[in-house]
């Protein structure tokens, strides 16, 4: 440029005793303050490297001539200092060149002036211009006092508080130059003199660090939004290979600010915030605020975009899926037990959309929908209410006092699972009567009683408190009380005559077997049956039979006990009277069946059932003891009893297992002969007579079966089965069948058929307590045993409390030797009775013989 000119090489000798280089390049400075010295690369030597030039500038603050070595050649660059006095000097010095001899005095004088007046000092900037020249231009400075203090404090703060990577933001032109650095071209051997480098460093660091933004970034520690790239003070300088190298090496001194950052990385990361702002996020995809406002949910008639329609359809499908598990069947015991608590859980799991917007949506739907939709909704509402009515009842929370009172009245059942499983529910009789009535109405073969009473049993199970009744299932997995239909003797239903006689029946024998299978006789009777007469007969309902039977049980038993023939009564008189049955040793299911045999409703309490059975047994034994037992009765008295039975409402019937043989009023049956098997036993006829009556809905046996049921659990031996007077009236063993003579029925249970230990007593001598209660008293009254050699000897009661396995033989031996003696009991018990007692109390018991056999 035209502001400065570079003089030619001069051979001026050194002055003032200082030796300099052979070639000195004079620099002429323009007199105006805007002018700048221009250094042209006219020197034949190679230019100095940027690192060497930076070292010379930083190590010579006293304005001395620095020696620069480049490519083995020594060149001396004169350091020029432009002060305010020099810039504002007269135009005489405009074209004068500064030689090496005059450099030192001038520099010394100007240095003194600069130190004396800081306000007049200016800083020199090295700027790059397109071409191969360096421009040293002066720049007026601001007030140094305030600036110095501020920059030093900020510098200290930056070193003490900033821990991140901070770099100077460069202009796009500088970034391109930085990315592509051309090889350095030869520069002039004389470098410009720069003054006040320390102040320049502080000002550049202050402008490049950007402490305010860095502090904000440190506090937030989040990427800053994209903004205008700030320009650095050095951005005005144009590209030059030599000048560019000077700038880069000069900025290398501030490694703390440039550490970890580069211009290329900044350019690549610049467009990233734009993509993050415009791109979708997970929170924006959810958009939950539309569902919580009533205005966001529109009715089907309103126009809405397809996206909202799809979202509403998907939400409706989700609501329907939530409601489906509520309608699932109770297929497990756990689900049945927790059914009453599931109401609270379902309300907690409902969708919040339904709870918040249920009332508003209903109002909007009613106002905006047509009449046809309103009718459909009304029908849906009714169906929903009906469905909800069939659901589990709402359980109310009672006060604590009432809850404790209910606990006091609650009865606890102890025993094994098999014992509790056979318990009867409260609705047993009602179910049996309902099933029997439905079968009696039709003579066609109906479906089994299991499927007939399925709905009622399921409905009753919802309110039943017996958990064991819920364990019974049918083939479809539905809950069913199978025990009440299959195991209960009073619930046997047969609809057709052929099906009735296909049942296997058994009866007690007076011989040693106690059980006789009469399946063969039933087949012959079914073959000879007259179906026409069976259709003409009218049967009363099962409920009437039960009602009349319960009212006239004792009177009927008294009449039936008087029908014992001579041979049977004499045989019974020779035998010892049986003991009182041990009702305490029965299981809960056996006690319930005994109570049902007497005609009472099921009772939950075990103690009440035992006391009731004992009273019934005592009353029956007293009546049988007081009433006379004639050897025979005339047919007229028997006919009178039957007439009374018919007047009371009971239908006279006959059974294949009954010993009261009847004849048809229209046909006369052939007489059958009876072959005696033993002198003291009763014999069956080989030729079965034809019976014209129909099998009853429940099994009924002869009067003797009542005594079997009463004493079926006693261990004593002795039985009495009275026969009809026709057996003893003829000595040859022929049976007489009077006309219009029907039999009298008394119910029995399944225990009467399968039990082989039962005995029948005509009279009872003494009323003794049950062995079960006596065993309990003996075990509890055992005194404590002293320790033997420091080892405690627990009693039987303590062993039971500690859940130790009780050996049946040892406990029976102790009871017979000393246990019953503590309470004044003279009877003895065996291991079987002890086992029944243990099972009734839920005590763990083992057989001693089995343990010894396994050990060997």
Curated annotation (Swiss-Prot):
- What InterPro entries does this protein's entry cite? Slx4_ascomycetes, Structure-sp_endonuc_su_Slx4
Any one GO CC term of the record: Slx1-Slx4 complex
Q: Where is this region: Disordered?
A: 1-24, 38-65, 88-121, 139-202, 296-326, 362-392, 621-640, 668-689, 715-742
Indicate the principal place this protein occupies in or around the cell. Answer: nucleus
Q: Which Pfam family is one of this chain's hits? A: Slx4
Spell out the post-translational modification annotation for this entry.
Answer: Phosphorylated in response to DNA damage.
**A GO MF term:** 5'-flap endonuclease activity
Q: What is the annotated localization of this protein?
A: Nucleus
In what ranges is there compositional bias, type Low complexity?
Answer: 51-60
Residue spans of biased composition, Polar residues class = 1-19, 296-309, 673-686
Question: Which keywords does UniProt give here?
Answer: DNA damage, DNA recombination, DNA repair, Nucleus, Phosphoprotein
Listed Basic residues bias regions: 139-152
Q: Which GO terms describe its biological process?
A: DNA recombination; DNA repair; DNA replication
Query: How does the record describe its quaternary structure?
Result: Forms a heterodimer with SLX1.
Q: What does this protein do?
A: Regulatory subunit of the SLX1-SLX4 structure-specific endonuclease that resolves DNA secondary structures generated during DNA repair and recombination. Has endonuclease activity towards branched DNA substrates, introducing single-strand cuts in duplex DNA close to junctions with ss-DNA.
Q: Which family does it belong to?
A: Belongs to the SLX4 family.
What is the official name of this protein in its record? Structure-specific endonuclease subunit SLX4
